[in-house]
Protein backbone atom coordinates (compact mmCIF):
# COMPACT_ATOMS: atom_id res chain seq x y z
CA UNK A 1 0.00 0.00 0.00
CA UNK A 2 2.76 2.42 0.92
CA UNK A 3 4.64 1.97 -2.34
CA UNK A 4 1.45 2.47 -4.39
CA UNK A 5 0.73 5.74 -2.59
CA UNK A 6 4.23 7.08 -3.25
CA UNK A 7 4.32 5.83 -6.84
CA UNK A 8 1.04 7.68 -7.48
CA UNK A 9 2.87 10.84 -6.46
CA UNK A 10 5.59 10.16 -9.03
CA UNK A 11 8.27 8.71 -6.76
CA UNK A 12 10.40 5.74 -7.80
CA UNK A 13 9.96 3.23 -4.98
CA UNK A 14 12.06 0.24 -3.97
CA UNK A 15 10.68 -2.00 -1.25
CA UNK A 16 12.22 -4.55 1.08
CA UNK A 17 10.50 -6.84 3.54
CA UNK A 18 13.38 -7.25 5.97
CA UNK A 19 16.69 -5.72 7.02
CA UNK A 20 18.94 -7.91 4.87
CA UNK A 21 16.87 -7.25 1.74
CA UNK A 22 16.92 -3.53 2.45
CA UNK A 23 20.70 -3.52 2.88
CA UNK A 24 21.08 -5.46 -0.37
CA UNK A 25 18.93 -2.86 -2.16
CA UNK A 26 21.08 -0.06 -0.72
CA UNK A 27 24.19 -1.77 -2.06
CA UNK A 28 22.71 -1.39 -5.56
CA UNK A 29 21.62 2.23 -5.08
CA UNK A 30 21.62 4.60 -2.11
CA UNK A 31 18.08 5.97 -1.74
CA UNK A 32 17.16 9.66 -1.81
CA UNK A 33 14.82 9.09 1.13
CA UNK A 34 13.87 6.13 3.31
CA UNK A 35 10.58 5.25 4.97
CA UNK A 36 11.49 2.70 7.64
CA UNK A 37 9.12 0.71 9.83
CA UNK A 38 10.53 0.24 13.30
CA UNK A 39 9.01 -3.24 13.51
CA UNK A 40 10.53 -5.43 10.78
CA UNK A 41 10.72 -9.23 10.65
CA UNK A 42 13.77 -10.80 12.33
CA UNK A 43 15.71 -7.54 12.89
CA UNK A 44 14.17 -4.14 13.51
CA UNK A 45 14.26 -0.81 11.72
CA UNK A 46 16.62 0.62 14.32
CA UNK A 47 19.17 -2.09 13.50
CA UNK A 48 18.74 -1.40 9.78
CA UNK A 49 19.42 2.34 10.18
CA UNK A 50 22.50 1.73 12.34
CA UNK A 51 23.88 -0.76 9.82
CA UNK A 52 23.03 1.45 6.83
CA UNK A 53 24.88 4.40 8.35
CA UNK A 54 27.81 2.24 9.45
CA UNK A 55 28.29 0.77 5.97
CA UNK A 56 27.67 3.79 3.78
CA UNK A 57 28.21 6.82 6.03
CA UNK A 58 25.12 8.45 4.52
CA UNK A 59 23.92 10.76 7.28
CA UNK A 60 22.25 13.05 4.75
CA UNK A 61 19.64 10.53 3.53
CA UNK A 62 16.35 11.66 5.11
CA UNK A 63 14.44 9.05 7.08
CA UNK A 64 10.78 8.82 8.05
CA UNK A 65 10.35 6.33 10.89
CA UNK A 66 7.00 4.52 11.14
CA UNK A 67 6.02 2.98 14.45
CA UNK A 68 3.09 2.27 16.71
CA UNK A 69 5.47 2.55 19.68
CA UNK A 70 5.18 5.56 21.94
CA UNK A 71 9.00 5.45 22.19
CA UNK A 72 9.40 6.29 18.47
CA UNK A 73 10.31 9.93 19.18
CA UNK A 74 13.12 8.92 21.55
CA UNK A 75 14.38 6.31 19.09
CA UNK A 76 14.21 8.81 16.23
CA UNK A 77 16.18 11.38 18.20
CA UNK A 78 18.82 8.80 19.12
CA UNK A 79 19.17 7.76 15.46
CA UNK A 80 19.09 11.26 14.01
CA UNK A 81 15.86 10.59 12.12
CA UNK A 82 14.22 13.63 10.54
CA UNK A 83 10.57 12.65 10.98
CA UNK A 84 8.29 10.08 12.55
CA UNK A 85 4.76 8.96 11.82
CA UNK A 86 2.59 7.02 14.23
CA UNK A 87 0.93 3.86 12.97
CA UNK A 88 -1.73 3.97 11.77
CA UNK A 89 -1.12 7.19 9.85
CA UNK A 90 -3.00 9.30 7.34
CA UNK A 91 -1.81 9.03 3.73
CA UNK A 92 -1.75 12.81 3.39
CA UNK A 93 0.62 13.12 6.37
CA UNK A 94 3.07 10.75 4.69
CA UNK A 95 2.76 12.57 1.37
CA UNK A 96 3.49 15.93 3.02
CA UNK A 97 6.52 14.58 4.87
CA UNK A 98 7.96 12.92 1.78
CA UNK A 99 7.47 16.07 -0.32
CA UNK A 100 9.04 18.29 2.32
CA UNK A 101 12.07 16.06 2.91
CA UNK A 102 12.70 15.48 -0.81
CA UNK A 103 12.51 19.25 -1.44
CA UNK A 104 14.88 19.97 1.47
CA UNK A 105 17.41 17.44 0.20
CA UNK A 106 17.20 18.86 -3.32
CA UNK A 107 17.77 22.41 -2.09
CA UNK A 108 20.81 21.31 -0.06
CA UNK A 109 22.22 19.47 -3.08
CA UNK A 110 21.83 22.60 -5.22
CA UNK A 111 23.61 24.89 -2.76
Regions found by a protein language model. Give the residues of each.
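Short amphipathic alpha-helix used as the core "switch/output" element in two-component signaling
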Residues: 24, 46-59
